[in-house]
């Protein structure tokens, strides 16, 4: 009986996660590294998909914005944990205490292994850099 209950729970969790991804907003088209941080972040905020206040600002001025509660964003089929960006002299972004990473930079942090993410990004023809963050957490980043 316990085995059947575990299977049912696993099935329910799997179906729930698939349902969430079915209603996800894909944003990989904007990760072509030809935009600015403002052009990447502002439409997501105006659509009500992304928080307007960063959850964190790094010393290098990279701002981390969470998707709003109930919103699911994806990039190359991977669920987006956070959108990261900075653009100099733009009121959407708060400066950090150190030297800014660039005049404009943007990207996402996704739930996925770096090798799998890098493969999908390359296959899509994007110029984005892929960076390992932690096990199964990967950054996709553009500095146009």
Question: What are these model-predicted stretches?
Answer:
Residues 1-11:
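Bacterial N-terminal signal peptides that target proteins for export
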Residues 12, 22-24:
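N-terminal Sec-dependent export signals
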Residues 67-123:
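Long, charged/polar, surface-exposed segments that mediate recognition or autoinhibition
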Residues 25-83:
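N-terminal secretory signal peptides
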Residues 25-33, 108-109, 138-144:
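Short, extreme N-terminal segment that most often corresponds to the first beta-strand
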Residues 55-61, 97-104, 129-137:
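Short, ordered beta-strand-loop transition motifs
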Residues 17-21:
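N-terminal signal peptide c-region/cleavage motif recognized by signal peptidases
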């Amino acid at each position: 009986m316990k085995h059947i209950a575990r299977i049912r729970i696993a099935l329910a969790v799997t179906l729930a996660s698939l349902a969430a991804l079915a209603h996800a907003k894909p944003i990989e088209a904007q990760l072509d590294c030809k935009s600015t941080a403002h052009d990447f972040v502002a439409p997501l905020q105006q659509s009500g998909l992304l928080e307007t206040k960063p959850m964190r600002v790094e010393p290098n001025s990279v701002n981390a914005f969470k998707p709003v509660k109930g919103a699911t964003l994806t990039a190359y089929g991977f669920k987006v944990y956070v959108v990261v960006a900075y653009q100099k002299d733009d009121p959407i972004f708060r400066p950090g205490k150190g030297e800014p990473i660039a005049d404009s930079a943007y990207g996402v942090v996704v739930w996925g292994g770096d090798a799998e993410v890098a493969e999908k990004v390359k296959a899509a023809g994007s110029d984005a850099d892929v960076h390992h963050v932690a096990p199964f957490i990967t950054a996709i980043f553009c500095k146009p």
